[in-house]
């Protein structure tokens, strides 16, 4: 498992917003939930997606390496939720799930459950007072 970070990072450590620590902690958290991710090479690229249809998307190259593009101006909550959603797509690709409707349905299902679980965990680095209800 290798996690790379690239792009135009908008780091604000004071409110734990999308810093590399959060990204790596979230990836470790997801690997605990879905061990198949441990075998993946993933790059998280923060980029301006203002003119795109969503907050993030996932690609896989010919070498089997995954590239997750994620909007660089999201709130902490949206960043965590979006990265979880895209990492679920990585898991699905590794498992061979190709049906787009099933992929999106499962990703939306997990993003809600796992974002709450991650934010309540010590891995998030989020102070208890800032954990969304």
Where are these regions (language model features)?
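Short, intrinsically disordered N-terminal pre-domain segments
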Residues: 1-4, 133
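An active-site-proximal "capping" alpha-helix that borders the catalytic cofactor pocket
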Residues: 102-116
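Auxiliary, metal-adjacent structural segments of Zn-dependent hydrolase domains
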Residues: 6-66, 72-76, 116-131
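Hydrophobic recognition helices of helix-based DNA-binding modules
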Residues: 90-91, 114, 118
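Acidic-and-aromatic substrate-binding clefts and catalytic sites of carbohydrate-active enzymes
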Residues: 77, 98-99
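Active-site recognition of the HExxH zinc-binding catalytic motif
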Residues: 81-94
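Hydrophobic (often cysteine-bearing) scaffold residues that line and stabilize catalytic clefts
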Residues: 22, 80, 84, 103-106
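Short, function-defining helix-loop hinge/capping sites that tune catalysis or transport
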Residues: 93-97, 112
